[in-house]
Design a protein with these regions (language model features):
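Short, conserved active-site entrance elements at the starts or edges of catalytic domains
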Residues: 23-66
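Short coil/turn segments at secondary-structure boundaries
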Residues: 54-55, 149-153
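Short beta-strand segments
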Residues: 55-92
Length: 166
């Protein structure tokens, strides 16, 4: 897999923060970091250092593996707007979609944990005009999504999640 090495530092980040992000964006490092993040998030119910990643809130997203058929849990940055929760499959601008996004696209069944609140969600992938309408809001909230998208050949998948009616 090719990793875009020459993504310039955005103006909104400090040099040291950007350097660390660039050093840790290899898939193997992301995978190991995600496992540790899931464990500490669950233990703390998302309190303390586990809630914010790169300055944006983090949830735990559990999907059904499109190949394995088993539950897979990953941390993901999100934007909550009322009852709507948005997640973006950016994976730091790597040249492939994150597994969780491919899982949601193939099997739109998921659960999320935001701090101590766990619930099943309805999943809708936003494409075309629906994606275009929300993209400026998402990138204003978390500028890294927009910055990485500028330097990535693939279009990041965007999903809207809503609490499943009981």
């Amino acid at each position: 897999m090719k990793i875009a090495e020459r993504i310039p530092k955005p103006d909104f980040m400090e040099e040291a923060e950007w350097d660390l992000l660039m050093k840790t964006r290899a898939p193997e490092i992301i995978r190991l970091g995600a496992r540790a993040h899931v464990q500490t998030y669950r233990e703390s119910n998302g309190e303390g250092d586990t809630y914010l990643t790169q300055g944006a809130p983090t949830l735990l997203l559990t999907t059904i593996g499109r190949i394995s058929g088993t539950e897979q849990t990953m941390p993901a940055n999100f934007l909550q707007d009322g009852d709507d929760v948005y997640v973006v499959g950016s994976i730091a601008g790597l040249d492939r979609h994150p597994h969780w996004a491919l899982n949601l696209d193939t099997k739109p069944k998921a659960w999320i944990q935001i701090k101590a609140d766990h619930y099943e969600v309805d999943v809708k992938r936003l494409v075309g005009d629906d994606r275009a309408a929300v993209w400026p809001v998402l990138t204003e909230f978390f500028p890294l999504w927009g910055h990485f998208q500028k330097y990535c050949d693939r279009e990041f998948m965007v999903f809207k999640l809503n609490r499943k009616a009981s």
